[in-house]
Amino acid sequence: MNTKDNPKFLRWFNFFSYFIFSSPILVLFFNSVLDNYALSMTIYAAQSISCSLLEIPFGIISDRIGRKNIMVLGAITRLLCFIIWAMSYSFVPLLLGAIIGGASDALASGNNDALLYDSLCDTKQKKSYHKIYARITSYYQFALFMGSLIGAVVAFYSMRLAIILNILPLTVALGLSLVIVEPKCKAAPETSFIRQFVAAIKNLWNNRRLRYVAAGDGLNYGLNESAYSFNSVFISQFVPVWALGIFKSLGHLLNSFGAHLSNRIARKIGIDRTAGYGLVADNFMNIVSVLCNSIWTPIVRLASPLAEGIHSPAINTIVQDEIPNRIRATTLSIASIFGSLCYSGAAIFIGYLADITSPYWALLAAYSIALMVDSLVFVGLKYRSK
């Protein structure tokens, strides 16, 4: 077995990693245990903080000890997180599971994409990265779609059963991580952790194409993801609560379809235009959905995940092409933590604005700012790849 099989295993690894049944009801499960929404949201916050603290250290370690080891450890911790949650009947074990889940997110962030890129480098297929990454994205978005639908049915009978059933696909994902072959196409890392980190920062700053695209993508992620988390409050004015899960599932399905189209569109109009125009379409349709302010809002908003599925693989490919192998995971982790910080700031901004005005104005402001931020990506795309 060699690295040429890695993309195939990565597709199915991502499918089973995201084929979970608790996505639509996780906060409801936490609340069923804790009977307190503030404490329930604390579990989410703990997972986010854990990921943020560990993201850069794990990225540096990945560049030094190898991608496969980090991937296996990430699969183990993700499985352990859900095992602990399945057995939890109080706050402390839920918190412990969240901290371990955050570590799993940090281990996967940057590392798994770097593993794919290095594997394609081994087989001299780097130019196929966009096509293969888009296919992997399509797989895991379809897994989220299927998991959300099945999970909604299972949770109707037992929310804890939905958590327990997650253990099965995550065990399969762990098994798939063990058959991955460590790529050889990886330059020697810097001599120390500090130099590794500094080298990644310098690359981000000195490479103007990478700097602007990564900054625009991180700000877009923060604004759009925080708005997406809050969107249910706005949409619940127009549809019953049970329909929110259906619209969320359809969003994953359309995202999967968009990812399937991404490489085809890039072949026709170029990867830069696919990334830039896709971002604009994503944010524009979000604004239109808010302006509808009616039953049409959740329907129009379904165009957003379709556009996201198209532009996300293109942006990821552009960023990957600008990073040297020796600092790949480190650089991706820095970019990821920037996006997480933007998410935290945007979430506070949206919540505060909703309190003093309304969810309508808060979401309209967030999506409008995101549309303006797209200009950073277009500035970056003007510079040629190094």
Give residue spans per PLM region.
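Transmembrane alpha-helix termini and helix-breaking/packing motifs in multi-pass membrane transporters
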Residues: 32-33, 85, 144-165, 233-239, ...
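C-terminal ends and interior cores of transmembrane alpha-helices
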Residues: 76-89, 280-293
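Juxtamembrane intracellular "pre-TM" segments in multi-pass secondary transporters
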Residues: 1-4, 181-216
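Cytoplasmic helix-loop-helix junction between adjacent transmembrane helices
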Residues: 99-141
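Helix-loop junctions on the cytosolic side of multi-pass membrane transporters
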Residues: 166-192, 379-386
